[in-house]
A protein has these predicted regions:
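Bacterial N-terminal signal peptides
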Residues: 1-9
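N-terminal soluble domains immediately following signal/targeting peptides that reside
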Residues: 14-142
Length: 142
């Protein structure tokens, strides 16, 4: 009975378990014989979203014209913060797609979710075991 109450009870705090100042990142890495793909997601809580809106003059509405200049530049900057090496050689990531969402947050403030699919081709001449090293240097001070 207690389990049901926990599962069905209020879910306050699930969106940003570290609070409304948090920035959470996720990188899903898919490796094939031809390429490495990184599905990169950044979840900004209410305060970082507000700061981005103020700094960049964006409107928290999907499709707003302000996002046409913001999103490509932001995702390029985030891509520069990712390091991907195979067998000690850096790979060049290319942006395949980007997306942005503004889920509602606490107190009626928006939050922001940024997403990108990055892809790097692998050289076709290599065979056998290979070593991949990934590093995310974005938001290092947080």
């Amino acid at each position: 009975m207690m389990i049901a109450a926990c599962l069905l009870g209020p879910s306050r705090g699930l969106a940003h378990p570290l609070g409304n100042f948090s920035i959470n990142q996720y990188a899903g890495i898919r490796i094939t014989s031809e390429a490495v793909e990184i599905r990169y997601l950044v979840d900004l809580a209410e305060i970082p979203t507000f700061q981005e809106m103020q700094d960049w003059g964006i409107v928290a509405t999907v499709g707003d014209a302000s996002l046409e200049r913001y999103l490509p530049g932001k995702m390029e900057a985030l891509k520069r913060g990712l390091r991907l090496d195979v067998d000690g050689h850096p790979l060049s990531l290319q942006t395949v797609s980007t997306e942005i969402l503004f889920p509602p947050g606490a107190g009626g403030l928006p939050t922001m979710k940024l997403g990108a699919l990055y892809r790097a081709s692998l050289s076709s001449g290599a065979s056998g075991a290979r070593v991949l090293h990934y590093r995310d240097t974005n938001f290092a001070s947080r």
